[in-house]
Amino acid sequence: MRLRITNSVTHLTSSLLFHLQKRRKLFSTLCALWFCLLGQGLLAQPMLFTNARIIVGDGSVIEQGAMLVDGESIVAIGDAGELSSAENGTTFDLSGKTLIPGLIDAHAHIGYQGRNGWGAENYTQENLIDNLQQYAYYGFVAVFSAGSDAPGLAIEVQSRLALQQFQGARLLYAAGMAPPGQGPNNQFLDQALAVEKSTGANILWGLENPEQARAAVREVAAQDFEFIKLWVDDRGGSQQKLAPSLYEAVIEAARSAGLRVFIHQQFAEDMPDLITAGAHGFLHGRIGSSLNAAIAEQLSQSNVFVIPNLGLGELRSEAIGADRFLGQVLSSELRSQLLLGANRRELSVSRSPQLEAEQRESFAALIDAGVDIVLGTDAGAIPNHHFGYTGHRELEIFVRLGMSPMQALQAATSKAANHLQLDDLGLLQSGYSADFVILDANPLEDIRNTRSIMDVYLKGKPVDRAVLQQQWQGQ
């Protein structure tokens, strides 16, 4: 359901129409300017959202709160009754609702999953935008695409988003580095190499020796990359594992250039040396018996984050097409592929009690040590691991393994924003971007209530989720 408001610009618009009808050229010009200004939010009214439960994102809650938005920014937040809307502003009574900061997916691979299939042929500007719109539909306001993007196309999409030509999650992307011609899982590797060929872009940077690795870092820094993603994984013996001398050279050069380095590592046992080398974070937690208290303490002392990334394994065998929450964005063709019986998926997937216990113990070690656990999904790295939806499922896994709902929400908001250096996202505080989600139910009571999305706002503007849903289901 969309919030209904009475827009006070209506009276002003009517007056303009009355006085300018006989001056058609001037009328057309002013109308174009008027709607441009409206589109850019320059004529937006202040909005007061009041009587809501406000989950700030830093672990605190305002049970009966209010938030004032002016243009693209949050300008005040506090107890209901203490804030009032500016003159000519609009007030929304959100009694019984919950406000949360917009969510962030800190590990994905956009562009390859399309409306009716997965692969390199989908990697177009239009599909990148579609993926970012799907993230926004599910309440995600930013996504980090980890080392599989053609930078030219990514920059074009970023520019269009900055110009507000569409509403979608913010896009961050990285230069991917690994031994030559290697890195992603073998299925995904073929698709990334195909995109390299079709676009002429350098997506996967092959590392051969330390000096060449340092030169590669200098080159990506000159191209204004902010992140590097390293693969340190032999893929079960099918690829060459990146040598310590190479990842040490990359991390050292990246730190000198002001770039952040995130790691796909094969085992938890790889983590100590990578932490010592200066890695900023791990895109796979390798949660289990090998990720013990000693590694957790080293992570904490070095302020290195961990993305558990557990849904990638759990959901690939589940009949997710039967989940109505995902069905909202699926084409009829794709829905039929994902229903019970298709691809040998099951409605209920049994989990190993031993593995579950090991993961719970590993999670507890990370939490007790104060490690920043961050939400990431690896969405898009394999077929039908869907954007946005998988983030909500990952939150459910976090809570199942021992996090509180509040801790899980912080992993998807303030902690993700901090490690991605998104200084205006992740919190509902004055001065931050007005990127937030209105929920019909309280996620602190049940984390699955993050699914109860009433509205999503990006830069102070509501996302038209109904139009997006109709568009996607019709494909």
Predicted feature descriptions by range:
Residues 1-23:
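N-terminal secretory signal peptides that target proteins for export/translocation
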Residues 44-46:
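Boundary at the C-terminal end of the N-terminal hydrophobic targeting segment
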Residues 52, 412-414, 433-474:
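C-terminal cap of metal-dependent C-N hydrolases
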Residues 54, 58-100:
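Histidine-rich, glycine-flanked metal-binding segment
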Residues 94, 98-99, 103-116, 121-233, ...:
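Divalent-metal coordination cores built from histidine and acidic residues
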Residues 114-117, 241, 271-277, 312, ...:
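Histidine/acidic-residue-rich catalytic or RNA/ligand-binding cores of hydrolases
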Residues 256, 343-442, 462:
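His/Asp/Glu-enriched, well-ordered alpha-helical/loop segment
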